[in-house]
């Protein structure tokens, strides 16, 4: 299998040949630089979690239109990326197609989060990424520490007491889990929760994570020997095997199929902007820990939403019991709007209907939107997403604010 750098060069060369232009400068830009490239203001904030991770937040405080609100304050919309992703997800399409720009132009104060261990959140008060302890976490810690820290920072800066949350993939899993663990009313900071490609169970998942779950038994002790400890960077022979197994028979460019993001989420889409693919690949994957990937694999085998399984001895130490506990989504009590696709590899429609919808309190599910011909990445990069998803959410939030909610 070609190395990541070789894949990048191949995709870049193909794009330059096919579309007749040099490499797009956005491939080397940061999220704030992309935002400013299109004439929008970009602000950067650091926030430190209770366990010492320093997360970088990106903000578009206003757009290119003059929108006034009854109380003089712009509603805050917080967008949280998915697995192996970053804040760039919301800005790498054109301004007329990217969620962050559309919401900014609609008059919202847009905040983009970055989970620990991705491109923008590689700092800790005491640890360095070269330390194995830096990577000792999964999405358990993201929901416990990262979400509260980021959201409370956005509210502190804007002087507001609640906001509207849009999550994609892991950004939904962590929010469902955070709300299910809420014992002190923290959930009141979330006015409405818009869940794109929502994840609860991944029992019926397809792609790379399904391959790993099937290939190795639950009792397998060599996860970290295979994947490496620390940042998730699989060995070449592993990804070669996965690529051949997952991508066999699919009509996709080899460079795209080699990309771990598409191996996880599904490479087939009929609504991606082909000219932007080199930019997608340049910014994604954005990094996570091996332990986080192992947690996802455990979820595939578990069939529900378990906390990280440390093994019998480790579970007794962390949870006070031998068996790993699971999150209880029936306790989620904020208004939820679901947007899920019939062609999604990671947020499989069967998992949405058979698990998520049966575990959420029906009174909290305000909308349940099934979208046709949507795969996992179409929710953030699909050309139909503005009309099918972003514009309806913009209207929902606007009406909520104007009605004084």
Swiss-Prot record:
Keyword field contains Hydrolase: yes
Subcellular location field: Secreted; Lysosome lumen
Signals that turn on the gene: Up-regulated in the intestine by fasting. Down-regulated in response to a high-glucose diet.
Residues spanning the signal sequence: 1-20
Enzyme category, top tier: hydrolase
Principal location listed in the UniProt entry: secreted
GO molecular function: hydrolase activity, acting on ester bonds
Functional description taken from the UniProt entry: Lipase that, together with lipl-3, plays a role in the response to nutrient deprivation by controlling lipid metabolism. Specifically, involved in the breakdown of lipids during lipophagy, a process during which lipids contained in lipid droplets that have been delivered to lysosomes by autophagy are degraded.
Protein name (database record): Lipase lipl-1
Organism field: Caenorhabditis elegans
Gene symbol of the encoding locus: lipl-1
């Amino acid at each position: 299998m070609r190395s990541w750098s070789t894949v990048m060069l191949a995709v870049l060369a193909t794009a330059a040949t096919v579309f007749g232009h040099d490499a797009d400068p956005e491939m080397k830009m940061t999220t704030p630089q992309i935002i400013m490239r299109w004439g929008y203001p970009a602000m950067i904030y650091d926030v430190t979690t209770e366990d010492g991770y320093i997360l970088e937040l990106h903000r578009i405080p206003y757009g290119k239109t003059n929108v006034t609100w009854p109380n003089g304050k712009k509603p805050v919309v917080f967008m949280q990326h998915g697995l192996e992703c970053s804040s760039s997800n919301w800005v790498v399409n054109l301004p007329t197609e990217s969620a962050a720009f559309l919401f900014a132009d609609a008059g919202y104060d847009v905040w983009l989060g970055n989970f620990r261990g991705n491109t923008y959140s590689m700092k800790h008060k005491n640890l360095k990424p070269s330390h194995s302890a830096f990577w000792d976490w999964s999405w358990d810690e993201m929901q416990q520490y990262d979400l509260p820290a980021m959201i409370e920072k956005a509210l502190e800066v804007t002087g507001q007491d609640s906001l509207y949350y849009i999550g994609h993939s892991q950004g939904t899993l962590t929010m469902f889990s955070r709300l299910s663990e809420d014992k002190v009313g923290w959930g009141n900071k979330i006015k409405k929760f818009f869940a794109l490609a929502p994840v609860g169970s991944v029992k019926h998942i397809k792609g790379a994570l399904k391959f790993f779950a099937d290939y190795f038994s639950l009792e397998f002790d060599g996860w970290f020997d295979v994947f490496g400890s620390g940042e998730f960077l699989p060995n070449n022979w592993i990804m070669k095997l996965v690529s051949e197994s997952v991508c066999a028979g699919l009509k996709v460019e080899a460079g795209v199929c080699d990309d771990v993001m598409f191996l996880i989420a599904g490479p087939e889409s009929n609504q991606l902007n082909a000219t932007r693919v080199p930019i997608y690949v340049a910014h994604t994957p954005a990094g996570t820990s091996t332990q986080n990937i192992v947690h996802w694999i455990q979820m595939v085998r578990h069939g529900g939403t378990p906390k990280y399984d440390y093994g019998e001895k480790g579970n007794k130490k962390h949870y006070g019991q031998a068996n790993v506990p699971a999150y209880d989504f029936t306790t989620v009590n904020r208004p939820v709007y679901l947007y899920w696709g019939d062609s999604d590899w990671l947020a499989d429609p069967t998992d949405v209907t058979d698990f998520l919808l049966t575990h959420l309190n029906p009174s909290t599910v305000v909308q349940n939107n099934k979208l046709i011909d949507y795969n996992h990445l179409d929710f953030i990069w699909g050309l139909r997403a503005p009309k099918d998803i972003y514009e309806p959410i913009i209207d929902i939030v606007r009406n909520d604010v104007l009605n004084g909610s």
